[in-house]
From Swiss-Prot:
The lineage of its organism: Eukaryota, Amoebozoa, Evosea, Eumycetozoa, Dictyostelia. It is found in: Endoplasmic reticulum membrane. Pfam families: MBOAT. Residues 18-34, 96-105, 160-177 have a biased composition (Low complexity). It catalyses: an acyl-CoA + a 1,2-diacyl-sn-glycerol = a triacyl-sn-glycerol + CoA; all-trans-retinol + an acyl-CoA = an all-trans-retinyl ester + CoA; 2-(9Z-octadecenoyl)-glycerol + (9Z)-octadecenoyl-CoA = 1,2-di-(9Z-octadecenoyl)-sn-glycerol + CoA; 1,2-di-(9Z-octadecenoyl)-sn-glycerol + (9Z)-octadecenoyl-CoA = 1,2,3-tri-(9Z-octadecenoyl)-glycerol + CoA. The keyword Endoplasmic reticulum applies. Pathway: Lipid metabolism; glycerolipid metabolism. A motif (FYXDWWN motif) lies at residues 477-483. GO terms for cellular component: endoplasmic reticulum membrane. Belongs to the membrane-bound acyltransferase family. Sterol o-acyltransferase subfamily. It comes from the Eukaryota. This is Diacylglycerol O-acyltransferase 1. It is a multi-pass membrane protein. Residues 1-52, 95-186 are annotated as: Disordered.
Length: 617
């Protein structure tokens, strides 16, 4: 009877194991599914963390403009965001792909003290929807940031452990110090307060002096001298506006307008490509190839149309500016949607909240696509800051001001610049250095007026008009480039939409892939030089590469003058001299080349005679 219980026990064990045998493959399948979900979540977490740090890196690059030394009255203390700097190191560092994603922190190395720090992992959707502006007014940080943080931490615990007697002693010591150290100025002041140690107001030692009165005087002198030249020019030449230069060569075709309307084909193509990719109608490689073809065609096809139909140069320049603008928008549109599709592979948000257009792929509509093509920015995002309403009075004032100043620019070009450049053809052909220098200096004043007015009309008036109509909230289209003491600050601040596009679409991806800062800067200038050359050479049908090499040479000038002129007034003077004298020389060279290659444009235009020599009163 003793062997019976073991036999019964074996039967029971066998009976217990029998229902578990068919569950073995099911459990393995569940484990495999769980592993695939974990791997997928791990990859998504890594992409979300990379996207979060990418945004911090871009924000840190933009806020460098607030701390740059290449301007007048540059900040003496460098304000920095330590979190963004450490995030930037994490963004640029090579990470291990086999990270354990069960933890909520990812190791990074702080650029301040070289120690390992932890960055809390956040959801990218929270950052996009509730993004707070970075505050630059943080406490000043010296080079030894770790020492400051350690001292502050030690001081915090020290205050908690102090007793009341120590606090009283510290307060008494502080009061004694305040009483025993009066202001130095009061020690040197006489009894009646009439005399003290102080410099002259015009001395360099004087602080806080205002020279606004002198600025008003210089403005009055400038207006008076300019108005005198206007009267003198009218007495000698009369009204010399030539409307033949602005007429449309083929009224039945309107080549400039037709080429501009052609851009809509590429905008719709970009929308259809992203829509097909979101619905997975085409493979990823096919969508990637279609994006490249569309981005290249938006530049090549309209440029070839300008060469074929030959509109007048004024119309051609406007069309080429539109082509470059919309090509940059289409590239940014494809880049951001491709990135969002990787962050949302199953498009689950589309099912959860189909009405929210600030999440992918709900943003893929023809209306939102054209809204982005109209707003004054080149960087595509899922959401933008919006103004509450359209200010009709503000909009009307800006429109009237833009039309008035545009007519003023048209009058100045015809009345002053064209006669001067026409009179400069003969000295340029004879290579008469003295007359060439005289023409450049004579052309510098009207050219500077036209350039400044053109900047004000486009970047301040036109972009604000478009922003007001579309209720686009961010109106920082430029910064104080006129205070530049170096060319680096000028090129980063005079055209902020292009600067944003370069940082987001060129500089940041190159830095992410391990390229150096100088290589990123070089590629930004290279792309900018290509666009400048297209705007100039295509309308004038002349590929001389002067604009290309002129932009690329800026890198050499920046490298030579960056450390010498930072924050110095002399640097700002040299900057303005290069603007005042450099631009007229470029205008003369391109005009001479265009007249020699296209004499039919001015066949019926008589060159103006030189004015009689008159004494300067």
């Amino acid at each position: 009877m003793e062997p019976i219980p073991p036999s019964n026990g074996n039967k029971n064990n066998s009976m217990d194991k029998q229902p578990q045998q068919p569950q073995q493959p099911q459990q393995q399948q569940q484990q495999q599914q769980q592993q695939r979900r974990d791997q997928r979540n791990s990859k998504l977490n890594e992409l979300n963390e990379t996207e979060r740090v990418r945004n911090r890196f871009i924000s840190h690059e933009f806020h460098k403009l607030d701390r740059t030394k290449s301007r007048i009255d540059a900040p003496k203390i460098s304000f920095s965001d330590s979190e963004s700097e450490s995030d930037s190191e994490f963004f640029l560092a090579k990470r291990n792909t086999n990270n354990n994603n069960q933890n909520n922190t990812s190791p990074t190395f702080s650029s301040a003290n070289g120690k390992q720090s932890n960055l809390t992992q956040r959801k990218i959707n929270t950052q996009i929807q509730s993004k707070q502006p970075t505050n630059n007014n943080v406490q000043p940080l010296t080079d030894d940031e770790g020492t400051i943080n350690h001292s502050n931490h030690h001081h915090h615990h020290h205050n908690q452990n102090n007793n009341g007697n120590n606090n009283n002693n510290n307060n008494n010591n502080n009061n004694n110090n305040k009483i025993s150290t009066p202001p130095k100025q009061e020690e040197k002041m006489t009894m009646n307060g009439l005399f003290t140690l102080r410099p002259s107001i015009l001395s360099s030692e004087s602080n806080g002096s205002s020279y606004r009165g002198f600025l008003n005087l210089l403005l009055i002198l400038l207006i008076t001298a300019s108005f005198r030249l206007v009267i003198l020019n009218h007495l000698l030449y009369g009204i010399r506006i030539n409307l033949d230069l602005y007429k449309i060569s083929e009224y039945h075709r309107w080549p400039g307008v037709m080429i501009s309307l052609m851009i809509n084909l590429f905008i719709i193509a970009a929308y259809l490509i992203e829509k097909a990719a979101a619905k997975q109608l085409l493979p990823d490689r096919i969508c990637y190839l279609l994006r490249i073809i569309n981005c290249a065609a938006v530049i090549i096809v309209p440029s070839g149309s300008i060469i074929a139909f030959s509109p007048n140069p004024a119309s051609g320049i406007i069309v080429m500016i539109l082509i470059c603008t919309f090509s940059m928008k289409i590239i940014s549109y494809a880049y951001e949607n491709s990135k969002q599709r990787k962050l949302n592979p199953d498009n689950k948000k589309f099912v959860i909240d189909p009405t929210n257009t600030s999440i992918y792929p709900n943003n893929l509509s023809l209306r939102s696509t054209y809204w982005f093509m109209l707003v004054p920015t080149l960087v595509y995002q899922l959401s933008y800051p919006r103004s509450p309403k359209i200010r009709k009075g503000y909009l009307l004032r800006r429109i009237v001001e833009a039309l008035s100043l545009s007519l003023l620019i048209l009058w100045m070009v015809n009345q002053y610049m064209l006669p001067l450049v026409q009179n400069s053809i003969e000295p340029l052909e004879k290579i008469d250095i003295v007359l060439i220098v005289e023409r450049i200096m004579k052309l510098s004043l009207p050219n500077l007026y036209v350039w400044l007015l053109g900047f004000y009309v486009f970047f301040h008036l036109y972009l604000n008009i478009v922003a007001e109509i579309t209720r686009f909230g961010d109106r920082e289209f430029y910064r104080d480039w006129w205070n530049s003491t170096g060319l680096d600050y000028f090129w980063r601040t005079w055209n902020m939409p292009v600067h944003h596009w370069m940082v987001v679409l060129i500089y940041t991806p190159m830095r992410r892939r391990g390229f150096s800062k100088n290589m990123g800067y070089f590629m930004c200038f290279f792309v900018s030089a290509i666009f400048h050359e297209l705007v100039i050479s295509i309308p004038f049908h002349s590929l001389k590469l002067w604009g290309f090499f002129g932009i690329m040479s800026q890198m050499v000038l920046i490298a030579l003058t960056k450390n010498l002129m930072n924050g110095r007034n002399l640097g700002n003077v040299i900057f303005w001299i290069s603007i005042v004298l450099g631009q007229p020389l470029v205008v003369l060279l391109y005009y001479r080349n265009f007249v020699l290659e296209n004499p039919e444009w001015y066949r019926n235009v008589e060159p103006p005679t030189s004015p009689p020599v008159m004494p300067f009163y």
